[in-house]
Curated annotation (Swiss-Prot):
The keyword Cytoplasm applies. The record marks 50, 114 as: Part of a proton relay during catalysis. GO terms for biological process: diaminopimelate biosynthetic process; lysine biosynthetic process via diaminopimelate. This is 4-hydroxy-tetrahydrodipicolinate synthase. It comes from Streptococcus pneumoniae (strain Taiwan19F-14). Keywords: Amino-acid biosynthesis, Cytoplasm, Diaminopimelate biosynthesis, Lyase, Lysine biosynthesis, Schiff base. Pyruvate binds at residues 51, 209.
Length: 311
């Protein structure tokens, strides 16, 4: 698979990792959840990303997860593998392993967290990962999690690199507009913020890498279709009703809220792994009321404005 395969993907779901109560991966829960996503307009799937609780997964567990999902998906939509860490050497070794494993359209590599590299350090980091294999690389720029921000200027330097094909951008709409205006033609720009998807698509982004698509894929698809048909009034009306649901899904450290909703819907998402904990019972009930029932009053006591998924 290639850039062209991903170019057709508007809604890429950042897949949760289902766990048993003892913390082991619940592989039996994967088929039903995958079929649910594909039935509700997921165009591609990201595995072993932040929403998958990747900091708590070993590389061996990630490879097991990859195999299980590939078996169910069976080529129906493109898959992206989370491959990056804050250790360049480890990222290089894992991207080689994933490339050899096969079956992925791209690897997602996050901006290095905690060690706070310079712009040149980040440039060299991603260049080294891209050079390590023929697996196309998408950069994940999320300063709310990693502390440092890859600037648009550095991003555009990397966009010219042959094996770097896109970015999951979680900085600002201003940065996104600048990147869209100045990027090479074959460079994908996704927002990683569900609440910004309406604005990003109107700016010319390629799509969203989403948490909300686990539970609200139909609404997102309807909104994107309205945008494509230049029906801004309809798209904006959907967005206004969608925002409270996004707020609810990020009102507690993610992916705890979306797992609470999926468990309620009958999918065995299970708990989170420490250090993340499930949403408290009363909070989970409010989240479910908003996301499933559209009961926007349920979240007003604790959520105002637009929450950004910095956590």
């Amino acid at each position: 698979m290639s850039y062209q395969d991903l170019k057709e993907c508007k809604i890429i779901t950042a897949f949760i990792t289902p766990f048993h109560e003892d913390g082991s991966i619940n592989f039996d829960a994967i088929p039903a959840l995958i079929e649910h996503l594909l039935a509700h307009h997921t165009d591609g799937i990201l595995l072993a990303g932040t929403t998958a609780e990747s900091p708590t997964l070993t590389h061996d567990e990630e490879l097991e997860l990859f195999a299980a999902v590939q078996k169910v998906v069976n080529g129906r939509v493109p898959l992206i593998a989370g491959v990056g860490t804050n250790d360049t050497r480890d990222s290089i070794e894992f991207v080689k392993e994933v490339a050899e494993f096969g079956g992925f359209a791209a690897g997602l590599a996050i901006v290095p967290y905690y060690n706070k590299p310079s712009q040149e350090g980040m440039y060299q980091h991603f260049k080294a990962i891209a050079d390590a294999s023929d697996l196309p690389i998408i950069i994940y720029n999320i300063p709310g999690r990693v502390v440092v921000e890859l600037t648009p200027e550095t991003m555009l330097r990397l966009a010219d690199y042959p094996n770097i094909i896109g970015v999951k951008e979680c900085t600002s709409l201003a940065n996104m507009a600048y990147l869209i205006e100045h990027k090479p033609e074959e460079f994908l720009i996704y927002t990683g913020e569900d609440g910004d998807a309406f604005h990003a698509m109107n700016l010319g982004a390629d799509g969203v890498i989403s948490v909300a698509s686990h539970t609200n894929g139909d609404e997102m698809h309807e909104m994107f279709t309205a945008i494509a048909e230049s029906d801004m009034k309809k798209a904006a009306a959907i967005q206004r009703k969608f925002i409270p649901k996004v707020n609810a899904l990020f009102s507690y450290p993610s992916p705890a809220p979306v797992k609470a909703v999926l468990n309620y819907m009958g999918f065995e998402a299970g708990p989170t792994r420490l250090p993340l904990i499930p949403a408290p019972e009363e909070d989970a009930k409010r989240i479910i009321k908003v996301v499933v029932d559209g009961d926007y009053e349920a979240t007003k006591a604790t959520v105002t404005g637009v929450l950004r998924p910095d956590y």
